[in-house]
Amino acid sequence: ANPFIGFGTKVFFNQTEGLKDALMHIILQFSWGLCLDESQYSVFCVDEAHLLILAGETAKMMEQFVRRSRKYKNATIIATQEPHDFADSKVLTSGKAMFNSSTYKVIMHLEKDGVNDLTKLTKLTDGERNLIGKFKMGDAILIAGNRRIPISIKVTDDMFKMIA
């Protein structure tokens, strides 16, 4: 049996805002409910989070998931290419809380505007801001607590086949 459950949400984006918000709420609540089983480890992963963070109460829900996940043997992964949406004034408080509650952050290349938005969410030194703008594919900063570690992510052929 496949231990993964995935939801394709592409069709949601052709729906009205109200319907899209309701569907997103149902999926997030259902998914989070599966993560509350303390007898097993789980991962709650939201990819392309910038596409849904501004919908309805999504930011507040995801903030609570990030804050509470460790209590339930859960790791929460929120991935985005657009820190701008997390820094939007409508969700900035929740966006900051998600970043500040995260045990680990992996920051890859961003353009200047993306770096500026990221600094609204988490503290970066001038050197880190410059470095993030110059990263090549696979380069990143791993933030673990107060430690900042430059890393390079290499994908093997087997890994690429698995995710492609």
Identify the residue ranges that each predicted region occupies.
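Conserved RecA-like P-loop NTPase ATPase core
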Residues: 7, 69, 142
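Structural flexibility/helix-modulation signal
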Residues: 1-8, 15
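Conserved P-loop NTPase
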Residues: 124-164
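Conserved P-loop NTPase motor cores
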Residues: 10-131, 157
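Short, solvent-exposed loop/turn segments at the edges of secondary structure
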Residues: 2, 100-101, 135-137
